Amino acid sequence: YINSPESVDRGYITNEEIHTMMNTDMPDKTHELVRDLFIFSTFTGLAYSDVKNLTEDNLQTFFDGNLWIITRRKKTNTESNIRLLDVPRKIIEKYKGMTRDNKVFPMPSNTTCNKKLKTIAELCGIKSRWTYHVARHSAATTVLLSNGVPIETVSRLLGHTNIKTTQIYAKITAQKISQDMEILSHRLEDMEKNICNAIQ
């Protein structure tokens, strides 16, 4: 039996690692840019090629008055509409006007991004092997699912053609299970008390 890419345990970064990354001084502007792009993808779920192809035209104020990315995934040509949170909005503002040809970001090559991410992980004292694609997995796991966003919404945000794909990406953390059971425990407190009393 050979592990297909679909069944491989997918890596992601944790909240703590995101904070460490943002609070670690970067050695130069390129490392800083790569870090910002990685965080941008962590908060939007966009893959490298989709961030690279992002133009000002993809940024639209939508029906709810918020800024959205309206785009199609390069890999699958599936529509992907993402309402922007504050973090990616701030990153877009930071790099505004730095590119020609209407692109949102001055994007280094994927190889450069992965090399710089390796250095950034070392600077942060993190042993995990980071590649740019880890950001997309982290969006599914750390940002969206761990904070209670329903899997159907995550699937649409990531532009998946099939919810099964989202289930592969979305490794629910033990922490999330613990939090959910804690909430459930509070909700069931009275019921459990009555049953436990009856068990004695």
Describe each region flagged by the PLM:
Residues R73-N77, N110, L158-I183:
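Catalytic-site neighborhood detector that most strongly recognizes the C-terminal catalytic loop/helix
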Residues S7, K74-E93, T99-T119:
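C-terminal catalytic core of Y-nucleophile DNA break-rejoin enzymes
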